[in-house]
Amino acid sequence: MHIAMIAGEYPPRWGGIGSVVFHLAGHLAACGNKVSIITRSHKDKPPEQSGVSVIEVPWLKLPMAFTRSYAKNALKALKNLHRKEEVDVVHIHLPLASFSRKQFRFIEQNIAPICSSLHGSWLGEKQGVIRASNAKESATWRNPNDLAIRLTAKYYSKFERAGILESSISVANSHSTLNEFKKWYQPADDFNSDVVLWGCDHKVFRPPNQDDEEEQLNHEKIRKRYDCSDEFALSYQPETQTPMILAVGRLVARKGYMTLIRAMPKILEQHPGARLVIIGRG
């Protein structure tokens, strides 16, 4: 089967969607499928995977508006790809690609059935920005992406609605995400939808190998770097008095990092040896 994935994020543009698409494409290719990724251009080359080809298209470098320009160029690339090698399924990752209902219908009628993955909605993102502002998160008005979401989410939501109305099936990454789309966009009761929960790579996220000396030395080095290295922590025991709280993600207001930081004094009252480590870009 030839699967064309339209994804606004793909390595080296790492993000939630980019990570999902990278690993999903690799696994689908390993099962014997051919996967073509149509994504936004980037100055660095994407990592190679057997059975996966990457097609880069230009896009307008403006918050929110890029989703529309990228979709238009992705459609051109999809048409060209289909002429060269027939596509069996088109997998669109929403909300980073804004296709109109007319464009969705064209793909369905002239290229292949569409599976739209629902990673989240712009209206939901807007609510996240508003909640962040109410919680006094930092830079809610200074971050151009958050500001654009706050001001234009309603306009761009029509493209998401087009996706769930015109796709052969819509697949959400959680029941809450699916309920969010039903709440905001009110599709027909019989609209074709499903929920597939994303897993994790068990080769990466796994219990520690305590027989691997190099791994244990790295573990000890990290714990000592962040001053959370009592004997229980070094031996992975829950009785540790120096627990590490690890937060990983983009450093934007709607992720709630300032709320987490403000919570630390209360955490330290009960766990004085606790340490908070935040990793991300923003």
Question: Where do the PLM segments sit?
Answer:
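N-terminal subdomain of nucleotide-sugar transferases
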Residues: 1-44, 50-56, 82-85, 110
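Active-site proximal beta-strand in glycosyltransferases
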Residues: 3, 89, 106-143, 171, ...
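A conserved mid-protein helix/loop that constitutes part of the nucleotide-sugar donor-binding site
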Residues: 19, 23, 243, 247-266
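Carbohydrate-associated surface elements
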Residues: 41, 176, 199
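A short, charged, and often flexible helix/loop element on the N-terminal side
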Residues: 52-82, 140-152
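Short His-centered aromatic/hydrophobic patch
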Residues: 92-98, 118
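Membrane-proximal helix-turn-helix segments that form the acceptor-binding/catalytic region
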Residues: 122, 138-170
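Acidic anion/phosphate-binding donor-loop and adjacent secondary structure
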Residues: 182, 200-231
